[in-house]
Every structure is written in structure tokens, then in C-alpha cells.
UniProtKB/Swiss-Prot annotation:
CDD domains: GT2_GlmU_N_bac (cd02540), LbH_GlmU_C (cd03353). It is an enzyme of class 2 (transferase). Its cofactor is Mg(2+). It comes from the Bacteria. Binds 1 Mg(2+) ion per subunit. Pathway: Nucleotide-sugar biosynthesis; UDP-N-acetyl-alpha-D-glucosamine biosynthesis; N-acetyl-alpha-D-glucosamine 1-phosphate from alpha-D-glucosamine 6-phosphate (route II): step 2/2; Nucleotide-sugar biosynthesis; UDP-N-acetyl-alpha-D-glucosamine biosynthesis; UDP-N-acetyl-alpha-D-glucosamine from N-acetyl-alpha-D-glucosamine 1-phosphate: step 1/1; Bacterial outer membrane biogenesis; LPS lipid A biosynthesis. It comes from Bifidobacterium longum subsp. infantis (strain ATCC 15697 / DSM 20088 / JCM 1222 / NCTC 11817 / S12). One of its GO terms (molecular function) is magnesium ion binding. Residues 236-256 are annotated as: Linker. This is Bifunctional protein GlmU.
Amino acid sequence: MALSAAIVLAAGEGTRMRSNKPKVLHTFAGKTFLNRVMDSVAALNPDTLAVVVHFQAERVAEAARSYDEQVTIVNQDDIPGTGRAVQCAMAQLTESGKIDGPVLIAASDMPLLDSETLHRLVEFHTASGNGATVLTTILDDPTGYGRIIRDREGNVLRIVEQKDANRSELAVQEVNTSVYVFEASVLAEAIAGLKSNNAQGEFYLTDALETAKSAGKVGAFAAPDPLTVEGVNDRVQLAALSKTYNRRVCERWMRNGVTILDPETTWIEDDVRIGRDATILPGSFLQGHTVIGEDAVVGPYTTLIDATVDEGAVVERSRVQESHIGARTNIGPWTYLRVGNEFGEDAKAGAFVEMKKTHIGNGTKVPHLSYVGDARLGDHTNIGGGTITANYDGVHKNRTVIGDGCHVGAGNLFVAPVEVGDNVTTGAGSVVRHAVPDDTMVYSENTQHNVEGWKPAWER
């Protein structure tokens, strides 16, 4: 199946989103609308992939290039409409070389448009010998969509936009999805004669189908799953589609052996991976490339972003980002793990602990009320409550190293850079500024002063 070109339409503002950014840069299940559609289109390996931009053109172009450096960016001029967008794209593509064969055109506001549906559309188009083929679907409520008007034999006559449709046309439930395949020669002829004779004063790409009938057969292929071609025009639709899709994602994981107690409050993005017999408790958000091992327990009320949680680990009421939680390690409740933490096995970070860029050894515990940053903690070390690694000197982040088998007292302060050996014990309230050798007890002498008869200022 050779695809000469694919054109992604991303020029619109999306005014109903009421947003300061283009609609195509809003996210759905962890990816922008634009990137999701580009994913699906690119899977068909078109000879050329083009993205048409206009509103906040540079911003959208940058997002497209970050996905594919080789993408062709087409700037639509101030003449409105999808038909004009395709005119601009074809003019630029034909300048670069001959376009000969099927051309796929897709809107970029359908976040669930999948490569399988597109593949079947192109196959149907080619097998039917069509000059043009439109991807359609049947909706119980077709409000807002262009209607597919057929003749008595079922051939596609035209597509009528909602604002231009009469009463009988509005009753039609088969709708246009804004995805098409044209033969390049048919498309070139069809878009050449487009006019703006409509309520919006735009160049509609849908009008090209009527012209295409004179140059070749026009057909329609119905998407097997209406959800894959459902568009998003406002935030209400975005929320509804997100909820429906997330329910499907949760059901898929449950059928694969994962316990999800409340799918309504559990959100799982596409690139997440979960092992068998893991349990996801209510209020959990699993994002990015998070990986959860077998028998792990996540939640309730936990956010994992690009995190790895090994088998048997527990992460409760916590936020974890780009960190690795070792097997049978316990995190939480109310733990904040910033980027770059690496936990060994059977370790612990407890209540109101914050960590970043720290290695935590096997069996090591930081139970509560501590900040540990830019540090390395050895195996089987216990960190007392209220311990702080003072890692920032105002210019640089400095490293703290605490060895194996250490017992750190409550309320300790480690002034980095500092290194503490193995089997060291520190007294409560110690301030450790200098290196401590192995097998040492260290404490700070802080003299206590009692001022008798003291009264606070407001009582004097």
C-alpha cells in the first residue's frame, strides 16, 4: 500500500476551546492532539508527511518538528477553510516533486484516530478504484458534523456542513470525519475550482468531492469504531471523550490481570505498563512511561510520572517522578520523590519525606519528615526523623554520602559536600560538616541555656 503523501490539517484556532493555545496542542491521555494524529498517520509510511499551520504557526510547527524533524511545514495564508489548507499544501508539495498516487488528508482534532482505521481506509480506497474516499461514521447525535448525502444507489453525492444543511439533511446520521483519501490527480483538479459559497465564507474541502465525481468514483468507508473518529471541539467534549477512553484503558488492564478498584477515579496513559496482580487503588494517576511490576500496590491518591515501580513495592498517597522504586520497597504516605531517585530493594521513604537525585540502598529507611537531595545512602542505613541534607551553597548542588549500616539520629543536618563512612552512628541534633570515618560515633555539643522567669514580649 503506497501512500504518496499525508496532509495533517492543524491550522485552526479552535475558538470553542476558549484557550490561549491552539486546539491541536491540547493533550489527551498524555500526548497532544497533533502528536497523536501524527503517530497514526506516520505508521502508514507516506512518502511525504505535511502539517498545515496558521494560528500560532511557529508554535504548532515547532511541536510538529519535535515529533519528526523531516516533516514538511505548510503555512496556510489568511484565506480560511480546509479546502484552502489543502490548496496550500498541494502547491508546496508539487513544487518539491511530483505527487502521484493516494494522498491522505486528516484533521488533527481526533485524538483517537488510529493507524489501523487509516490503513483499512486506504486499502478500501485502492481496492475500490476510487478517485476519492471519505471516512465516515454513524452517530446517534450528529450535531455539529457534516452530513453524508448519498443517492438512491448509495453513492456519495456530497457532504453538507451543519450550518448549510436543510431539515432533511440534518436528519442524516452518517457524518463526515474530516479524513479523506484522494488520488493526487483527482485532488489537484477538485481543489482548483473551490469557491466560498457557504454560510461561513470558507473554502470547504468537502466541496471538492462534488468536483471529484467528474474525475473519478467517490466512495465512503465507515470507521468500525465511532470512538476512533470522534472529534473534540470544546473542553466538555474533551472531558467526555477522555473519560470514555480511560474506561476502556482500565478495562483492558483489568482483563490482563490488574486489579483496579475504581476505574472512574483511576487515570492511565497509553505508554504505561502494568504487571500481573498489581493493584491500583482509587485516585491514582499513572502518566508517561511509567512501569509497574507484578504484585505492586499503587495508591490511593498517588501520581506516578515516568516512574518504575518494581514487583511487590507499595506507593501510597505520594508523587513520584522519573524515579525507580526497588522490589518490596515502601513509599508513603505523603512522600514527594522528585526526578532521579534510585531505590534498592526492601527500602522505605515514609511520611513527609522529599527526595531528589538520591540513591537509596537495599533495606535503607528514611521514615519521616526529612529532605534528602543529591545524596547516596548505603545499604541497611536508618535516617532519623527531621534529617536534612543541606546540598545547596547558593551556587552549586553538593553531594552527601552516607555509608552502609549507619544510624542517623533525629534532627541531623548534613552540610554538603560531606562523606560519612560505614557503621556510623550520629547523635540527635548533630550538624555534620566534615568527613566521618567508618565505625565512628559523632555528635555535636549544643549547649543548653535556660532563662528563668522569661515572659514573651506580648506579656511584658
